[in-house]
From Swiss-Prot:
SUPFAM superfamilies in the cross-refs: DNA helicase RuvA subunit, C-terminal domain, Nucleic acid-binding proteins, RuvA domain 2-like
GO cellular component: cytoplasm; Holliday junction helicase complex; Holliday junction resolvase complex
Claim: Endoplasmic reticulum is one of the keywords in the record: no
Name assigned to this protein: Holliday junction branch migration complex subunit RuvA
Organism field: Tropheryma whipplei (strain Twist)
Keyword annotations: Cytoplasm, DNA damage, DNA recombination, DNA repair, DNA-binding
UniProt region (Domain II), positions on chain: 62-136
Length: 194
């Protein structure tokens, strides 16, 4: 079993990378969200999958991501490719939150996962992802929320830097604001700056 690989990233292909380790290039399938520079030193936590007709190595930036992958492939109807597609769209914290909340909608955003399979995933992973920290989810949501508001301000004609500064200023004062309130306060902030 190969638990991890450390080496020089030789090539990046859609859905896979080649990691050179002591002169041997390992083809490793990775989530679409994994995108380091070529010639960078990388460490991937891996899961070796042996099938009748193939041997494939799947790699992840964190042990947590690899653990969630291995939990996903235990579910009937979820093979390594579907599990990889899920981790290309959702973070481990988002998968765990969906399972914890019994909400299959985030999983349905993944290509190849319909309502029935999403429901099966939520049902079968219940209680199995307790090691996944959920506090990251709130931080990720805050970043997503900020990015959405910055994009809205750019759409209204403001520059990216001033939009980001306005949103940051508003959120420094009050983190509990709703998106419309943040947008409104950011517009007020920008109007005062002119």
């Amino acid at each position: 079993m190969i638990a991890s690989l450390s080496g020089l990233l030789e090539a990046v292909r859609p859905g896979s990378v080649v990691v050179n380790m002591h002169g041997i290039g390992f083809l490793v399938r990775v989530p679409q969200s994994f995108n380091p520079e070529v010639d960078a030193e990388v460490k991937l936590y891996t899961s070796l999958q042996v099938r009748e007709d193939s041997v494939s190595l799947y790699g992840f930036a964190s042990v947590l991501e690899c653990t969630v992958f291995e939990q996903l492939i235990t579910i009937s109807g979820v093979g390594p490719r579907v599990a990889l597609a899920i981790l290309s769209v959702l973070t481990p914290a988002e998968v765990a939150a969906a399972v914890l909340e019994g909400d299959d909608k985030p999983l349905q955003r993944v290509s190849g996962v319909g309502k029935k399979l999403a429901g099966t995933i939520v049902l079968q992973l219940a209680g199995k992802l307790t090691s996944v920290p959920l506090e990251n989810r709130k931080q990720e949501q805050a970043v997503d929320r900020s990015a959405e508001i910055v994009q809205a301000l750019i759409g209204l004609g403001w520059q990216r830097q001033e939009s980001a500064a306005a949103v940051e200023s508003v959120l420094e004062k009050d983190q509990s604001l709703t998106m419309p309130e943040i947008l409104r306060n950011a517009l007020r902030y920008l109007a005062k700056q002119e």
